[in-house]
Amino acid sequence: GHQLVNAALGGHNMLNFPRKHAVEHSEGIQHEIVAEEGSILNRLYGPKLLVNSFHRDCADAVGPDVKVTARSLDGIIEAIEHKTLPVFSVQFHPERMRGDAPNPAFGPDGTELFKYFVDLC
């Protein structure tokens, strides 16, 4: 989803990015990301948060009306927001960050991001 939104907004994606960043699908893989001040993620969760990793592809350039709002510590784009439209996307899977089976209990509750999305609609 994240890569599709990025491409639709004029961005470019890297498929099968370098192995040092790629993570096999498995339970409990996590990493820290840094959310930009004023971003949706920063307002909901603060400047740093733990998220899951279930990806081999990533956004590597965003369109002209899009801003990068979070990155992993190794520089992977983890969140984007359109500058004027109510459109945002994240690399991770917030639906798997609820602390209920089979979702591992770490980091913030991803439900808050869904609530934000529903309120935005």
Placement of each model-derived feature along the sequence:
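Catalytic nucleophile loop
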Residues: 1-10, 93
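Short polar/charged helix/loop
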Residues: 5-7, 14-15, 31
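A generic secondary-structure signal for well-formed alpha-helical elements
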Residues: 9-12, 121
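Amide-donor transfer/coupling interface in amidating biosynthetic enzymes
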Residues: 17-121
